[in-house]
Amino acid sequence: MLELRRNSSPSSAHPSPQTNCQNSQRGDGLHHHHHEAASGSTCCGGMTVFTGANAAKSSNEPAGSASPTVWRKTSHPPLHFNNNETRNRNLQMQLKNRGTKDDWGASLRYDIEEPTSSGLLELLPDVPIVRKLSRPLVKMDDQDDACSVASNESDRTVLSPLVPMSIFDQFLCLTNNLSALISCIIAEAKKNTEAEDYAVFLHDEDNKQMVLFNNETMLMTGKKFDMGYGIVGKVASTMRTMNIRDVSRCPFFNEEIDEQFSIKARNLIAFPLIDSSCSLIGVIVLYNKENGFSRHDEKYIKRFSYFVANSIAHAILAKQIEEVRTRIHMVEEFKIQGEDAVIEEVDIMRLVNDPLRDWRYFSQNFADFSFPPRSVGENHFHRASMMFFEDLGFSMLYKLNKRKLSYLVLRVSAGYRPVPYHNWSHAFAVTHFCWLTLRTDAIRRALSDMERLSLLIACLCHDIDHRGTTNSFQMQSLQKTPLSVLYSTEGSVLERHHFAQTIKLLQQEECSILENLPAADFRTIVNTIREVILATDISAHLRKQERIKTMISEGYNPMSFDHRYLLMCLVMTASDLSDQAKNFHNAKRIAENIYLEFFAQGDLELQLGVKPLEMMDRTNAYVPTVQIDFLFKIGVPVFQLLASVVPEGRTTSEAIDANHLCWVALDEEVRNNPSATNTLEYLRDENLERRIYDRVRKQDPRAAEIASKRFEPVYANGSVPQTQDILDHRFDGYDKKYQIGCSGGQNQSNGKQQQIRSLQKIRSKTSEDDALLKPMDNGGSVAASSTRRGSRTPRRLWRRARQLISSMSSSCASCSPLPSRRQVSEDSESC
């Protein structure tokens, strides 16, 4: 029999095992201890514990003997409790169940001091977190150092569970990577405690749950457990360490958690992670030590957990800061590129007051599919973009506000970044080709006006805010760019960003050119813009290529929504690749810009430790081979399909075939001279270009003629405007407001303007009557002035004309003035 005696009261009744189990499940005041000391009578806080008759024999046996009849005297360390009755009851239950089926050996370590901020500051050096820690060890009390794990006093070894400060240094260096930090923590804990497995849980304070970490990937699995669920929940809710010798007998043990790691637990120790602010960070569970976890392990974990908790807290804080930065970057990505750029009022009014122009104003060949639009100069891009909407009739049909359209064009041009290829000049070239296609009879019959308007707007904005990188670069996990975070789940990262920028522009009050449309039509146009901008992704085109071929072979059906969608995607892709369907000189210069952009991305990837593709590596890329392969697989089939649908665009198919032959000839010229291809300078060699034409001419004279066709002056991606002879310019009656004016308009120099005025004065002297009817004011015309004032002829002109007619006298009847209506009526009345 086990006898328990108090100093001033008789022995109390022993609680039943059922009561023990209930108290354990409630967790209110259950304080077990498995630490064993040497035999002898010991006073424990006012209570003396005696053993049975066999106590003397069992003094040298290990603690936790399975025999229920063998007991020994047990000495417990002083407990920090004010309620002695609760402590005595818990000790009774522990001793009563020793060696029975309810003996699961749990130790809720209440004898470990409360983790307070002052205590943690004593343990951690008072230095900034970024400063190197120099203190080699953490001091411990002598009472804690003298810790025994053996019951035999002669075999006892004094251990010092000291934690080197270098471990904390190592943890702090990994606070920028939570997964690597936890991996290092677990490795250190397993090495010092000889545990076989582990589990890590982090505290979700918002949802009051514990989130499970994955052992292999060291990432959050998403599996969550409520506070109080299982041993982990018990440790988290009480913030106490639990050392369990036999988990099969523990009422809190739950196999569901261990099944996540395929662990067959025998014993474990679970300890909370509490930071310097006494906040719960998480729980770490170590499994399956050979002889169970000892008191020495608990002392080590007590000190070790302080370092772990603060390191993980700093890592979580760093992760939260990084998430905030990512959100800020996302907001910046949603901002319109060039939004901070100031659009001058004078620039807006220049476009608003600019008269309607015919396409011949820019060049006689401006409406030719083979004409390189960049040759008109960047100072004409805005004016030509306005002309596209006017020429197709969209301004009148949809009542587009000219000021808002002007602001939209200026804002779109500011939204393109100064990258080598995907810049504002590329957008203008794509829009020019789309305009040529939309004004053909085939497309007018095949697509509706709203679809054509959507295509024109989409071409103008299709690469806005392009970064000069590819989709694959944006989606690389090493980069973690904000664009990939926003759009990686849907694919076509850059194209979706371009569409988002376009919609933000159209929703601005200053750019809302579609404000007069009904809501249904506006949604239709927006959806069409989205689909065709996404179609500029080459991978998306390759997925639709077979469907387009089937549509052409079966015959285009304008009533089919799918056929109209495929046709718009084809027009958009052809417009995006239209630079390769011009003359070879233009194609070469554009290819140089493309590879400058590719090489810049390749250099960036090398800096990030990523091996770039061969065509993006400036040391290994061979441009002719890449271009030949691209034209053969993508470029030539696209324009062959377009020529099948749009007969007026057959010249584009012939041009890209001729350019393909020229690239083959260029490959033959430079292949034997590797040193010449180290840079892109050979793409500008005029002598090499002439030799290429000679090679192609021997093979196909027609292809050589098409490839060598030049429109002078040609400035690919240049800013020099086209300088045509102003006086010899003809509009053939299309530009009604500028028939008499000059082709240069406001962009002509003052010398040219004076030359025009002097010529007009000379002409006015030869015919005074014509001069009166066609007065020139500042290079303008009477038609322009009459349009500004109204459709009526100014009274001063009629007055001057009457004076001239009345003063005229001639003997020739044919030259005499005709009688007025009043004179005719008076003569008839007199008769």
Curated annotation (Swiss-Prot):
Its cofactor is a divalent metal cation. GO terms for cellular component: cytosol; mitochondrial inner membrane; mitochondrial matrix; mitochondrial outer membrane; nucleus; perinuclear region of cytoplasm; synaptic membrane. The keyword Ion transport does not apply. Disruption phenotype: Reduced body size and an egg-laying constitutive phenotype. One of its GO terms (molecular function) is 3',5'-cGMP-stimulated cyclic-nucleotide phosphodiesterase activity. Binds 2 divalent metal cations per subunit. Site 1 may preferentially bind zinc ions, while site 2 has a preference for magnesium and/or manganese ions. Its EC number is 3.1.4.17. A divalent metal cation 1 binds at H426, H462, D463, D576. Residues 177-312 form the GAF domain. GO terms for biological process: cAMP-mediated signaling; cGMP catabolic process; cGMP-mediated signaling; chemosensory behavior; chemotaxis; determination of adult lifespan; negative regulation of cGMP-mediated signaling; phototransduction. It is an enzyme of class 3 (hydrolase). Keywords: cGMP, Hydrolase, Metal-binding. It catalyses: a nucleoside 3',5'-cyclic phosphate + H2O = a nucleoside 5'-phosphate + H(+). Residues 789-802 have a biased composition (Basic residues). May negatively regulate the activity of cGMP-dependent protein kinase egl-4 which in turn controls body size. This is Probable 3',5'-cyclic phosphodiesterase pde-2. It comes from Caenorhabditis elegans. The gene is pde-2.
